[in-house]
Amino acid sequence: MRNITISSERALEVIKAPQISEKSTFIAEKTKQIIFYVSRDANKTEIKSAIEQIWRSQNIQVKSVQVVNVKGKKKRFGRYLGQKSDWKKAFVSLKGDREIDFTDVKLFEDK
């Protein structure tokens, strides 16, 4: 994966939130991967550079990124049939035995 630089605003658009569930916790303990909800138009290199930029103060380096496009489920609202939006999630592996502290986010440097 090549390195690209993106703005802080784009980094926050790419990474929406960490996925916190029983399954994601199990995967994090077993395979040392962290799961994120990401923007549908983001690619692997953007996801990698966004994570490294958001958690730059913790010196986080990404080893690999795997992406899954998830189809929205069909839901019924009374007699009407609707559909939830499609979304994308990313499985991120970090170099070494690093862990991300989600409370420590510094995007802009103090001048």
From Swiss-Prot:
The keyword rRNA-binding is annotated on this UniProt entry: yes
GO molecular function list: rRNA binding; structural constituent of ribosome
Xref: Pfam families: Ribosomal_L23
InterPro entries: Nucleotide-bd_a/b_plait_sf, Ribosomal_uL23-like, Ribosomal_uL23/eL15/eS24_sf
Keyword Ribosomal protein among UniProt keywords: yes
Cited SUPFAM superfamilies: Ribosomal proteins S24e, L23 and L15e
Biological processes, Gene Ontology terms: translation
GO cellular component: ribonucleoprotein complex; ribosome
UniProt entry keywords in alphabetical sequence: Ribonucleoprotein, Ribosomal protein, RNA-binding, rRNA-binding
Family: Belongs to the universal ribosomal protein uL23 family.
Described function: One of the early assembly proteins it binds 23S rRNA. One of the proteins that surrounds the polypeptide exit tunnel on the outside of the ribosome. Forms the main docking site for trigger factor binding to the ribosome.
Quaternary structure note: Part of the 50S ribosomal subunit. Contacts protein L29, and trigger factor when it is bound to the ribosome.
UniProt name for this protein: Large ribosomal subunit protein uL23
